Amino acid sequence: MEEKMNEIQLKYGCNPNQKPSRIFMEDGSDLPVTVLNGKPGYINFLDALNGWQLVSELKKATGLPAATSFKHVSPAGAAVGLPLTDTLAKIYWVDDLGELSPLACAYARARGADRMSSFGDFIALSDVCDADTAKLIKREVSDGVIAPGYTVEALEILRAKKKGGYNVIQIDPSYRPAEIERKQVFGVTFEQGRNELNIDEELLSNFVTKNKEVPEEALIDMKIALITLKYTQSNSVCYVKGGQAIGIGAGQQSRIHCTRLAGQKADNWWLRQSPQVLGLQFVDGLGRADRDNAIDVYMGDEYEDVLAEGVWQTRFKVKPAVFTREEKRAWLNQLTDVTLGSDAFFPFSDNIERAHKSGVKYIAQPGGSVRDDAVIECCDKYDMAMVFTGIRLFHH
């Protein structure tokens, strides 16, 4: 490990014209991070430090290795290290890698939930990065990774990525920041207590619906949803299933637009597992990013763009049949037992109606709307179980 320092000079800030730029410790102490490879930038460090908080909290809450895929200071995906089914391994493009370590499974899930958004991500890992995880990272387009450590083999693999320029950051897992945090906006200093809220079973005890039966797996998914939201730009909602986020709606001014955006991402995750998409025959040599783009267009309303004569031949060996609206709805109707978390209350029941279309069965939200009764009534209509946490999770 390289020698620690209390300041790192950066090439520039958010944009190339914002100079000078650095990260440093105001009290003169050593930074909790060490750059092992590459030259991370301003936004890289923002993603890294937010992502590290997310995965370390997921590990604490679930006892499982965790990973997140960050883009522009919000997670595109987050997951814990549960084994992959054959179908998930295929849609995440890791079915050729054999059995993966739990940490590698966590990153495959985090990256795979929304591969379009995760392109060029910054990765955070809760555990020491092993060779399996490094091999998975090496094949993806990514800006960098932060972890509490790296095996010798993993570090060698990562240092060879991007012609030797891949950003690798090591963080001291014992580091704890001060209880008060500050930032400046337009020369004015803002100060607040850190959000040290623990997402635990006690927070998930106030069920307000008729259905109060929630399996252990769904309680874990609720924790994943809320911890993910804690580090997502508000307004935000998060759909979770099977130990991973499957749709995150971030930074929307309207709650229903969050729910729709994240719901569409969850729908796309499920549609990728349909026979129509699994049966696509890509031309030899087509890269993962091009396959992802082709699938995204094929599943969407603009499918004719990828099925046009002279276009489909560049992506597919055989021209795919149109994936009709009726076929998609029939497949989506099979998606069940999804968990939905929200960083603030649902003001109208339209959010519940939209969530139902994406298979939501369990909901965790603060409550506190003047229309809570209408929201609860809508949940009862669909036999959903909803918990009021009483805690808002805004993040800016």
Task: Put a short name on every predicted segment.
Residues 74, 129, 241-244, 252, ...:
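Active-site-proximal loop/turn and secondary-structure-junction residues that shape catalytic pockets
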Residues 27-39, 113-119, 193-212, 290-311, ...:
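Gly-rich Lys/Arg/Thr-decorated short loops/hinges at beta-loop-alpha junctions or inter-strand turns
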